[in-house]
């Protein structure tokens, strides 16, 4: 069974037209714990691959309205440095901060605005903090940010289930208020997300 763990109902509505018979959709709610719980539930109910799709923030050369595949994710608010000396984002059972995801075969061929494969930073923050920017971009090398993706990938890694993810960027650091950009671009980006979902997901069935 192919399962989709999606944070918000508006994102779920964008993905629904792409679902095929046998697919299941789990609307988790926002944040890492919600996303992890929904992912675990999906796996317990028989999912053998997990997909996470939605809107995200961006850094650097990403574009508003662009669609990007996630090849690895990191929890940038996970920090055990004072306990065991590991770098920010390194989970207790890992040697690297990066959680690998599966690539979506042929994505660049079917999604018109596909911008390539990126690193996603996930944390329970929605803000414009400068220290987050430095950590995410310079230390961790991420160009996408959300509040769920790495948690979904973390559970999948622990359970041995393939995880796929793609994001549509609504706001880019340096382009003005993050909240203002998100509100201005949300509906357009949901439309782009819907088209990308149909192109990617129908092709795989």
Q: Which role does the model predict for each range below?
A:
Residues 59-140:
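Mid-sequence, gly/pro-rich, charge-dense loop/helix-turn segments that line enzyme active sites
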Residues 3-5, 48-52, 144, 163-165:
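Short glycine-aspartate micro-motif
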Residues 1-45, 63:
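N-terminal short beta-loop-beta anion/metal-coordinating cradle
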Residues 125-181:
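A C-terminal functional module that forms or caps the active site or interfaces directly
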Residues 163, 168-205:
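Regulatory input/activation interfaces that engage signals or partners
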């Amino acid at each position: 069974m192919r399962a989709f763990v999606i944070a918000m109902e508006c994102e779920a509505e964008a993905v629904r037209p792409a679902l095929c018979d046998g697919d299941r959709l789990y609307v988790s709610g926002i944040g890492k714990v919600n996303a992890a719980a929904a992912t675990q539930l999906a796996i317990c109910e028989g999912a053998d691959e997990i997909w996470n799709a939605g809107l995200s923030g961006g850094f650097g050369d990403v574009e508003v309205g662009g669609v990007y595949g996630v090849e690895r994710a990191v929890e940038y608010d996970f920090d055990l440095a004072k306990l065991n000396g590991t770098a920010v984002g390194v989970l207790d059972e890992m040697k690297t901060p990066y959680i690998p995801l599966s690539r979506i075969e042929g994505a660049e061929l079917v999604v018109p605005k596909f911008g390539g494969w990126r690193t996603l930073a996930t944390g329970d923050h929605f803000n414009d903090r400068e220290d987050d920017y430095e950590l995410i971009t310079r230390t961790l090398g991420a160009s996408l940010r959300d509040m769920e993706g790495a948690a979904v990938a973390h559970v999948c890694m622990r359970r041995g289930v393939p995880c796929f993810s793609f994001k549509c960027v609504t706001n880019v650091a340096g382009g003005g208020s993050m909240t203002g950009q998100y509100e201005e671009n949300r509906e357009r980006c949901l439309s782009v997300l819907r088209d990308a979902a149909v192109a990617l997901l129908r092709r795989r069935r």
